[in-house]
Amino acid sequence: QSLYALDKELNGNEVLYLNLHPVSQSTVNFGDFKNIKPFPSNLDTYDFLNIADCLVSDYSSVFFDFACTKKKIILFTFDKEEYLRDRGLYISLDELPYPQVSDYKALLDEMRAEKNYDDTEFLQKFCPYDNINSSKQLCDQIILGKDCGLKTESMPNNGKENVLIFAGNLAPNGVTASLRNLLTLLDKSERN
């Protein structure tokens, strides 16, 4: 019901792209809405988020990545008590600088308001290495052994060979499930 009410309140130049959990996706008929659209499945999530004016998230960790854009983040915590009771969080919501709203009217007001919070401390804590060269710096430091000023922690030497497995984006599909099953079968007595 809230989605219908929110859609009616959105102006012609306001579009809300909704990325629902796959289980919930079939419960929403996007054809009923004028300004609420399904999140594009044919585009990379982060590429699409780069063009967004703001991010509305529940308890998903996507806001950690989006924070690097320094654009507005809104936490939609309509089911906070239930979520905290049933699932819990790694970080208290009170430690986050982002506005929290629990109903569609407050969400709409917050979406239309300017960013009015200081996320400097959050960015320093969780995104200290965010810059245009961060991937190069990480590779240079880890692969080439260059000191790029990145904080690292050495693994204790247990005499075993270290193996790095790159498995793509670990999308929720059969390939990822097979990889996870395979990893449980590996003999870890000779290699890390």
Where are these regions (language model features)?
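Catalytic donor nucleotide-activated moiety binding site of glycosyltransferases and closely related
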Residues: 3-40
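Acidic donor-binding loop of glycosyltransferase active sites
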Residues: 50-61
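C-terminal amphipathic helix plus adjacent low-complexity
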Residues: 105-168
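Short acidic alpha-helix that forms the nucleotide-activated donor recognition element
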Residues: 43-51
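A short, glycine/small-residue-rich beta-strand->loop->alpha-helix junction that serves as a flexible
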Residues: 167-180
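N-terminal strand-loop element at the rim of the active site
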Residues: 169-172, 185, 189-192
